[in-house]
Amino acid sequence: MIEKDMPEVSLLDMALMIEQELDELDMAKVEAELAQLSAQLEDYLAGSSSEFGGNKGQPWQGVLDCFYQQWQFTGDWQQFFDYQNTQVSQGILNRKGTPLTLGVLLVHFLRQSGLTAHGICFPGHFLVRLDIDETFHYIDPFNGASLSWQQMELKLRGAKGDLARLKQQDLKPDDIKSIIKRLLHTKKGALLRDHQFNQALRCSDILLRLAPGDPFEVRDRGFIFHELDCFNVAVDDFNYFIDKCPNDPSIGLLKLKIEQMDHSQTVMH
């Protein structure tokens, strides 16, 4: 069970476990590519790789150079919202993705190299923090660029509005569970845009296994059931949310949808 294994596995392993459940992932192919990349990185950092040549910089700079220059991992602007770009496994095979999928991979390779790296679920983006000699370095995994405070604040304002100001709490590292939930929400959003409601429902079910009874997850599952014309369970989910969060701004919309579904069921009978 994913939720039981979470304390014992790495971020990358957990992401791949979820994709194996959602997408019937060919793990042998992915693991073979991952093992090859790991071996290449070890050789590159040791300066003994005939393919890459030596590296005399700092280890973390070597990892970034190998990741972005040698392997040519890159952010996919053109198909940013495609479901494939939410798949870490496809990132390994195709060497492109979103800030989140590339960030999961970058954290993995940095940690594999003995470095202290963390993922940050930044508003509208995903960042990687490197801890070097009691100094924090922030990396944009979409392109490997180091980010200044001003650059990160611009990203924050792009996500939250021009009045937003960057605070230290915005840069706190997130745990595996938080990052996996962000990944699942991203997957679910891509599937909903593609009208893949059954697979989106599977994402929702995993999210509720990670946060049992969470009213917002239950409400969102209700919207998916509504799209699938499963009105009885959609009504149950909406009523659960209304009971748990009676002052939420979405209550009016939910009550309207419940009335519409009740009417539809009456007409069908």
Residue ranges of model-derived segments:
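A structural boundary/capping signal
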Residues: 1-269
